[in-house]
Amino acid sequence: MAQESQHGSKTLYVHPFDNETIWEGHSTIVDEIIEQLKENDISLPRVKALVCSVGGGGLFSGIIKGLDRNQLAEKIPVVAVETAGCDVLNKSLKKGSPVTLEKLTSVATSLASPYIASFAFESFNKYGCKSVVLSDQDVLATCLRYADDYNFIVEPACGASLHLCYHPEILEDILEQKIYEDDIVIIIACGGSCMTYEDLVKASSTLNVS
């Protein structure tokens, strides 16, 4: 990009997660969700949580903006899911201020950001969001189970959020409430292109995932 700029070409760098334009793009997911809920005659009070995986906080920030635009940011809790080894948001929350991770070790490479966007950190505290950190073993097991159930491959970054589908007790614990059959929990299933099934099996074998 620098070389192209020197030659007179117009260039534009868009940060992968710490950028308002990116957040606005992600925020439209919430608009689509609300539209689909209305089409299916599902009332918003039935939505008990919205779950998404978090790396640098781009998707999370967009979801917050979308909820806020629809006056739902204080009504629907967002559950931010990370994997141990790149849990920069959770570590920042524990410290009380944003931290920078010197080393990223999780297999969920799409979540591997050394820092969290400041807007994401501030929004988490402002709207009372929830933080969950999972092990690589748990996430890989979920990816393999999902592949068996639906014949579809997702990468660990996505498996982190899907893990709560298979283990609702984690969600109930973090929300401090029972999830009933008629309740709605929205899971943002993002990613899928960074790993093949063979990659998942190999990583699972290395980490002794049963």
UniProtKB/Swiss-Prot annotation:
Q: Does the keyword Cytoplasm apply?
A: yes
**GO cellular component annotations of the record:** cytoplasm
Keyword Lyase part of the UniProt annotation: yes
Do you know which InterPro entries this protein is assigned to?
A: Ser/Thr_Dehydratase, TrpB-like_PALP, TrpB-like_PALP_sf
Q: Tell me the compartments it is located in.
A: Cytoplasm
A GO MF term: L-serine ammonia-lyase activity
Query: Which EC number(s) does UniProt give?
Result: 4.3.1.17
Broadest EC class assigned to this enzyme: lyase
Recorded catalytic reaction(s): these are:
L-serine = pyruvate + NH4(+)
Q: Which domain of life is it from?
A: Eukaryota
Q: Which cofactor does it need?
A: pyridoxal 5'-phosphate
Alphabetical UniProt keywords: Cytoplasm, Gluconeogenesis, Lyase, Pyridoxal phosphate
Describe which pathway this protein belongs to, using the record's wording: Carbohydrate biosynthesis; gluconeogenesis
Q: Name one GO biological process term.
A: gluconeogenesis
Q: Which PANTHER family match?
A: CATABOLIC L-SERINE_THREONINE DEHYDRATASE, THREONINE DEHYDRATASE, MITOCHONDRIAL-RELATED
Q: Which family does it belong to?
A: Belongs to the serine/threonine dehydratase family.
Q: What is this protein called?
A: Putative truncated L-serine dehydratase SDL1
